[in-house]
Amino acid sequence: MAEYIARRYRVAEDVVTNFVSIAYRAGEKYSLDPLLILAVMAVESRYNPVAESLVGARGLMQIIPKYHPEKLDAHGGEQALLQPEVNILVGAQILREYLRRFGDTETALQVYNGALDEPTAKYSNKVFAEKALLEAMRVKARSKTAQSA
């Protein structure tokens, strides 16, 4: 999977391997599908750990510090957002909170993006499409591994 992501987003494979590993740990910690976390990263930052938006969202999961200060304080403050592990863990924590609060993945994703009132759910559809591609890559990789065994 890391190879696929690295090629598609033109990021070094060893860097992506680290992101994938962190996403799996975050998924386990927050009971989230790691592919959903990876899909959010793809849509939010294209796997750029130093991405910053015009509204101040930062890092892989594009977290806006002013909305989550308590989560960031636990990791040393908002400057920690440029550390991939912190960014992914905090992003996963936020996503988990929204899933609990709203009860479904589509709404949680729309809220994560600040687009709850967007009628076509364009953001969540992008994330779901990316997740489907990652799932296909995972199936392909497993099938390849099984064939070579």
Question: Where are the language model's segments positioned?
Answer:
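Catalytic glycan-binding domains that act on GlcNAc-containing polysaccharides
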Residues: 1-149
